[in-house]
Each structure stands twice: as structure tokens, then as C-alpha cells.
């Protein structure tokens, strides 16, 4: 009888221990699931753009938001990405609410007066241009291609219609600037390009900037594929300083995405900037002086499509664009 009682007691202790072990295991398992769930939630909040950016999109209706030392940028190619904020690079002072579109052209307004200049950029590809009709359409300035370097062989070529376009545009009362499509990989090549441009426009009336247009080639392999951010900045500076030393206003042309990821903006902040960003209003964070807002414009006197631009400065006089009557 006593032996049976001892066995029963042992069974009860074993059962109690087993229950305690099961309870402990259950608590540990629940805790693990809870912690893992919290970690998953944090990961989702960090990696999922919808989770991270929803408050920004709903509350601010902007493509940019300051987050410490970074900007959240929405890009049509890259999606939503963080890019650095540079405290020493001037930010844009353009009030996008003052940009209006009339008859296919965009204007920067102050009440009922226009505070911008309307422009186009063209090359030999536009063929023969009736500059009188272009002026009659309300075009104030034209950025004319001076030339280009081939992205494969690296050959520098001057635009066939450069001189004729400058002189004919000037005769019609249109101010002119020029741009060079660069594929330079060294500062020596950038200086070579600048010298070619300066020689080509010698004796011409160029009052708008002389522009360095260095672009990435996406559809083919190019000699510039491995150009670093540092080397590109060196090339920009070499070209612009050469242009400045000749008495012209240097400028850098770039699209928003490449500007934010490929240009060393702190090193290039002192040069005027021509922004390419197509749409109803620009979203680029930093300062720009000319905005190319369309590659699909139509202008009387020019066959086919043409790029359209706003200049926030009147480079013809070296001052902010003067006011004029409200556009029709």
C-alpha cells in the first residue's frame, strides 16, 4: 500500500513537471512570435515604400521630404529613393504655384505679369527654321547646339547649322545661347570641347549661356560608361572655367535623376544650371535657372517637335526676366 502511494506521488510530480515544461515552452514560443512579428513590422516599414512614404504623399503632395540629411525623391525610373541633402548648395526659390500653361507654353507669373522668358533648344535636326515665325509665336530665346562628341569614337563635331541659326535667330530678335553635347572622359577632352565651341561662336552674338551638356548613354555602350562622379565634376569645371575665361556665362545642363546621383553638386554649385524635367511643374530640390519642361512642343516655323524651356533670368540683360503683359 505504501509503495503504491509513493508511485502515485511520483506520477503526480512528473505530471506537474511536464505541465510546467509545457507552460514554459508555450510562453517562450509566444514571446518568440511576438518579437518576430515586431521585427517583421519594422522591416516592412523600412523597406516598403508605401509604408514609409504614405504620410508624405498624403500630407505634402511633394516628391521631396527632408529626413535628416537625405531627401526622399520620386523618380520615374528609379522609383522612390533617398538622396543626400547638401546644406551648402542653394535650393530652388521657384514657386511652382506661379507656373501656368497657356497655348502649349509654360510661364512663370506674378499676378497678371510674366516673370520668365520663353525658349526653345534646337540643332541641325530641326532643319531649316523660319525664325520670323518663331519670334511671332512668342519665343524669346533659343539654345542652339554648338556641336557634340560621339559616344563611341569620341570625335568632336560642330553642328552644321550653328552659325546660320545664331545669325538668323538674332536677326529675328531672338536671344541665343549654345550647348555642347559632351562625352568627355578627361579634363583635357572637356577643354578641347570648350575650345571647339568658343572657336565656332567667335564673332557671333551669344548672350545666353554656353552650356556643358554631359549625358549618360542608356541604349548602347559608351566611352563614358565608367566616368566617376569626381571625374565628371572635373570635366564640368574645366569646361565652365574655359568658357568663363572667354567672357561667356557657363552653365551645366542635366536631367533631375542624373543631377542628383551623378553630379557633385557642392563642387558645381557656383555654376548656373539648366534643368531637364518634363511635366507641368519642376520638382528638383536645388536651384536652377532654366527649366526644360517638354520635348514634345510645337512652334510655328519649325517642322516637327521641339524642346520647350523657361528661363527665370533674362540673360540678354544679365538680370532677372523682366515683367511683360499676360500671355494670351
Model-based region annotation:
Residues 1, 41-53:
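Intrinsically disordered, low-complexity cytosolic tails and juxtamembrane linkers
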Residues 2-23:
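N-terminal Sec-pathway targeting helices
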Residues 51-119, 266-328:
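Functionally critical loop-and-helix segments that line ligand-binding/catalytic clefts
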Residues 200, 204-210, 214-326:
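Surface-exposed substrate-engagement region within the catalytic domains
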